[in-house]
From Swiss-Prot:
Protein origin, superkingdom: Bacteria
EC number: 2.1.1.199
Reactions mediated catalytically: cytidine(1402) in 16S rRNA + S-adenosyl-L-methionine = N(4)-methylcytidine(1402) in 16S rRNA + S-adenosyl-L-homocysteine + H(+)
The protein's name: Ribosomal RNA small subunit methyltransferase H
Source organism of the structure: Bacillus pumilus (strain SAFR-032)
Family: Belongs to the methyltransferase superfamily. RsmH family.
Pfam hit, one: Methyltransf_5
Keyword rRNA processing: yes
Keywords assigned: Cytoplasm, Methyltransferase, rRNA processing, S-adenosyl-L-methionine, Transferase
């Protein structure tokens, strides 16, 4: 069963200023929590388009959202093709977009998907099960230098070199097949005192491999720009991030597009095309309330940023 606790539900959807006859895109359908609440505010003239590359998520969403009076369109695709897929449906502009960048709980909790360091399972981590690159391939075939780079860049792991060295030693003897084997190797690469602090010792490396396997940061950057381009004037975008790398991309994109470029002093009017594209609705990110954290610990690292197209 696809159970998924939605994070910052009302804040995310209410932040879009929903119009009942508007067109909205949920780029990360997942458990369909945000979509379900959004649909409750749409009339039969409204439209929701839900993107997901996970078959289980799409099947669950179809079931959960059946019977809504609004129009619903499900698209099985990575959101990096957001504009292209919408254009194929004859949609060239929208009134609101949601990104919820957390790995959905069912993906984390299904051991055979290989996302979790809590279960022993085959190394996989592909959001799209038909993709060629898996965690097993990264761990067993990528050169030492590339492993160090992704552990440091995507996992902000201090012991990147030591861990990559241990992986290199282990895979010379036999291929690393499971998450459990990888966890043990990671622990060997981290000094004992450091293993006792800062959460699970494999957390950062698993995050790094997942980001690399799914090309998450580049995909998000591309999709975010496409989403902003698709927005109608006064249309809004809500983005929930779960780690500093994604939040940095969102923050800098929003800041860049909501501020004026450096202009010569004393210009009487701002030249056309140079006006900011966005207005920030949230100066600082919205975080989960104490009340939400009581029943959903995964919301602890969530940050929500909202912007409006000018």
């Amino acid at each position: 069963m696809f159970q998924h606790e939605t994070v910052l539900l009302k804040e995310t959807v209410d932040g879009l200023n929903v119009k009942e006859d508007g067109t909205y895109v949920d780029c990360t359908l997942g458990g369909a929590g945000h979509s379900s609440y959004l649909l409750s505010q749409l009339s039969e003239k409204g439209t929701l388009i839900g993107f997901d590359q996970d078959d289980a998520a799409l099947d669950h969403a179809r079931e959960k959202l059946a019977g809504s009076k609004a129009n619903i369109l499900f698209i099985k695709s990575n959101f990096r093709y957001l504009k292209e897929r919408l254009n194929e449906q004859g949609i060239t502009s929208v009134d609101g977009v949601i990104f919820d960048l957390g790995v959905s709980s069912p993906q984390l909790d299904t051991p055979e998907r290989g996302f979790s360091y809590h279960h022993d399972a085959p190394l996989d981590m592909r959001m799209d099960q038909s993709a060629a690159l898996s965690a097993k391939k990264v761990v067993n075939e990528w050169p030492f230098e590339d492993l160090v780079r992704i552990f440091y860049k995507y996992g902000e792991e201090k012991f990147s070199k030591q861990i990559a060295r241990k992986i290199e030693e282990a895979r010379k003897k036999a291929p690393i097949e499971t998450t459990g084997e990888l966890v043990d190797i990671i622990k060997e690469g981290i000094p004992a005192p450091a293993r006792r602090t800062g959460g699970h010792p494999a957390k950062r490396v698993f995050q790094a491999i997942r980001i690399a396997v799914n090309d998450e940061l580049k995909v998000f950057e591309e999709a975010l720009e496409q989403a902003i381009e698709l927005l109608n004037p006064k249309g809004r975008i809500s983005v929930i991030t779960f780690h500093s790398l994604e939040d940095r991309i969102c923050k800098s994109t929003f800041r860049e597009m909501s501020s004026l470029p450096e202009l010569p002093h004393g210009l009487p009017v701002i030249p056309e095309g140079l006006e900011p594209k966005l207005k920030l609705i949230t100066r600082k990110p919205i975080v989960a309330s104490e009340q939400e954290l009581e029943h959903n610990n995964r919301a602890r690292s969530a940050k929500l940023r909202i912007a409006e197209k000018k």
